[in-house]
Amino acid sequence: SKVVEIKDLTKVFDFINETALFKGQWQYKQGRKSKEEYQQIVEETVLPKYKEIKATAIREKLLEAKLVYGYFPCQSEGNDLIILEDDENTEKQRFTFPRQPLEQRGSKNLCLADFFASKESGKIDIVPFHLVTMGRRASEHSAKLFKNDDYTDYLLFHGLSVESAEALAEMWHKRIRTELGIDGND
């Protein structure tokens, strides 16, 4: 496993899903407004606030993008993904995953374990895992804003920190796919 710290937050911000941030986290929704009216709100209110809060987060070092990731030998058995010790013989951990319900439209009744080499095949596969964080300061700053009844800034900063964590996960998922040579059209 490796621990990584991303110093340049703009690289993480490039992966932010702005729709999820603006509409989901920040609640700037079109509602009954016309497309043009909504776009005007986004351009005049949302984007300047977004730019400002990102600059503040960088300047005050409120977000600390860190992650740990690694590649682990594995095999599958039914709905289980079996993580193996480095010796590739000893079971270290077993995860059981659900299968898509047959009655779900278009379902192929797949399970995550189906995408890994089976124990029965005798082949050893690799599974990557990664965990991300935007750091303790993000949580502390959010808590401080909330405690001080600064709900608007709390909502904006907390939303940015949540979506930044999602962006970091997406960014590193892309990196893992590249390292594994399965990035295709990423």
What are these regions (language model features)?
Residues 1-155, 159, 180-182:
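Active-site loops and adjacent core secondary-structure elements that bind or stabilize anionic groups
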